[in-house]
């Protein structure tokens, strides 16, 4: 089940990531639905878009709680949550829900930046810290990033 988290309260330099879910949906109309590699067509799958969450832009924790609650509902219903962001921080809400259902959850992270800071400009809940927060939740405390394996102690 697809849902959007239009949030960008901790982005650096410029806002706009909150428009990501709408932009992804808009551009998806031009996608080819058939994959010759998978010999499958997206139209053969039941995919439901439940729309965007209404998130509080003044509180990262409140926004994350809403994202987590929605992911929990989807997981409890036996479905797979597919989150459209938004800035990187939205990932934390979904990971919080997923680790409750899958305690042995592992994370593979592809990005130009590690997002492993303990805090950024005094904030522990930031796009620049999100992977540190996620990996504090998972076991083992190691994960793969682009071109490197990191170990969090």
Per-segment meaning from a language model:
Residues 1-153:
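Conserved alpha-helical scaffold segments that buttress catalytic/binding sites
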